[in-house]
């Protein structure tokens, strides 16, 4: 079973629709028991990362998420929550990836568009993805390219579009708005 973690103002329902297309058993929840019983977790995109961090703390999920050892996929700001910190709001995040999430350089290049990604490291999350496939990006936050980056997208400069470390995965784009390539990414995560 997959648990999509509900920390308020997320795109959980859109992710749920995509998982339904893949005939996957899932639950949208913020209960500790659902997180611990799940085989895999999804941290969905949120409209406000600061509120998401606060909500995870209020629900006492921050500590649990830091120690759980199961595959986790962060989507959009869900991926940003997986970094060590969010520089612009001076907030500690989950610390899965040893890099800061930023907005300052992206402010001039707020991106809302479909774009292909450049794969720089082969990974199971990117199986059956080609350089012609386009993904839907939106937002003004980003993770700089780093040692965990597996693909990049160019918004003037190259930024991380996918990131991976052990059982932890993050994607900058929105798979539920990326058609078949987005569904393929979700399918790949489910098969990990």
Where are the predicted features?
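Cysteine-nucleophile active-site neighborhood
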Residues: 47-113
């Amino acid at each position: 079973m997959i648990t999509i973690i509900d920390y308020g103002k997320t795109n959980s329902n859109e992710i749920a629709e995509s998982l339904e297309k893949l005939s996957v058993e899932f639950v949208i929840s913020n209960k500790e028991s659902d997180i611990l019983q799940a085989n895999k977790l999804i941290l969905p995109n949120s409209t406000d990362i600061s509120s998401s961090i606060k909500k995870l703390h209020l629900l006492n999920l921050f500590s649990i998420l830091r120690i759980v050892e199961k595959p986790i996929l962060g989507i959009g700001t869900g991926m940003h929550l997986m970094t060590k910190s969010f520089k612009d709001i001076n907030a500690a995040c989950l610390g899965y990836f040893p890099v800061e999430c930023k907005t300052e350089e992206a402010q001039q290049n707020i991106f809302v568009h479909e774009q292909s990604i450049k794969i720089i490291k082969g990974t199971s999350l990117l199986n059956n993805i080609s350089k012609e496939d386009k993904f839907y990006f939106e937002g003004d936050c980003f993770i700089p390219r780093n040692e965990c980056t597996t693909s990049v997208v160019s918004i003037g400069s190259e930024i991380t579009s996918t990131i991976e470390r052990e059982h932890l995965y993050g994607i900058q784009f929105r798979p539920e708005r990326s058609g078949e390539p987005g569904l393929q990414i979700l399918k790949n995560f489910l098969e990990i």
